[in-house]
């Protein structure tokens, strides 16, 4: 009966039985496991059993030590989805603006960029070039938008989920860029041909 989760408790769930039924009914079902934050050993075991792809958010990757599990060269499995950002993160440009000088230097060096304005496309490039089975980005990254285009700030109320894309954000240049990047990184799905009768 609490209004928040502070008074809640963890309860044992059906574990893999739930995912077995989902897979029986839907196949893989297009599910991506949100495996961010603190993941306990029993949850890791369940994730392995379910075999759903986990999440790799590039904004979590840039610890100047270089050993972050979110850096593309550190992915332990291709069975993951790499994101340039999510609805709960700032845009890549907004995120970069808030970094300390040392981390900014590391990000630029890692991505091979000189200017902050190059960052959103560089993020998309490394996501697409990663070994992750799935790569995702946002219209905000394609357009290079900053914090003004952020969708959600977790644990806040009032100004979330208000940002909207405009028709003019969907440009031929963006489409050509993504199409070409998808081609050169071999991420285009195979074309399904209709059988001729």
Report residues per predicted region.
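Catalytic cores of glycan-processing enzymes that make or break glycosidic bonds
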Residues: 1-197
